[in-house]
UniProtKB/Swiss-Prot annotation:
Gene Ontology BP term (one): lipopolysaccharide biosynthetic process
PANTHER family: HAD SUPERFAMILY MEMBERS CMAS AND KDSC (PTHR21485), N-ACYLNEURAMINATE CYTIDYLYLTRANSFERASE-RELATED (PTHR21485:SF6)
Pathway as given in its UniProt record: Carbohydrate biosynthesis; 3-deoxy-D-manno-octulosonate biosynthesis; 3-deoxy-D-manno-octulosonate from D-ribulose 5-phosphate: step 3/3; Bacterial outer membrane biogenesis; lipopolysaccharide biosynthesis
Chain sites annotated for binding substrate: 34, 55-59, 63, 78, 86, 102
Name the UniProt record assigns to this protein: 3-deoxy-D-manno-octulosonate 8-phosphate phosphatase KdsC
CDD domains: HAD_KDO-like (cd01630)
Gene Ontology molecular-function annotations: 3-deoxy-manno-octulosonate-8-phosphatase activity; metal ion binding
Catalytic activity: 3-deoxy-alpha-D-manno-2-octulosonate-8-phosphate + H2O = 3-deoxy-alpha-D-manno-oct-2-ulosonate + phosphate
EC number, UniProt record: 3.1.3.45
Amino acid sequence: MSKAGASLATCYGPVSADVIAKAENIRLLILDVDGVLSDGLIYMGNNGEELKAFNVRDGYGIRCALTSDIEVAIITGRKAKLVEDRCATLGITHLYQGQSNKLIAFSDLLEKLAIAPENVAYVGDDLIDWPVMEKVGLSVAVADAHPLLIPRADYVTRIAGGRGAVREVCDLLLLAQGKLDEAKGQSI
């Protein structure tokens, strides 16, 4: 893969050598919630409770990343108890909710974990995510992201947000780091 323009065939389609090289160095994966971990729809109950659907495959990918020494964090603009519960279930300990300026949480994570920006991947779906995405080593937009975000990302998933896009990114990171086979048979 040393040739310029070379790519690696994956089960999701070809991935450029440049993206693979960036993915090799990722030690922290940061995720948005609405439109990334969920499909972006919010269901409101009669008593004001919020409901969102989370993809089990995304959860498995997150667990595999965590057990492969890749930290996972969430930075989201909204605040919801069910996101706290989902993080607890998956073992995500870095959760920043209600963040209208995601750069503040991003800076806090870098300092807390002593990680350089080039060792961070960020998955987003909308323009609120761009300020962080332009600072990380690997910026990822989900397939159904805002049209202005897609051309700015290093990698665009083939799968839509909430439908397995996070699993695709986790698999990409694990593949690039030679850890994908270690994930077989794990339980969440």
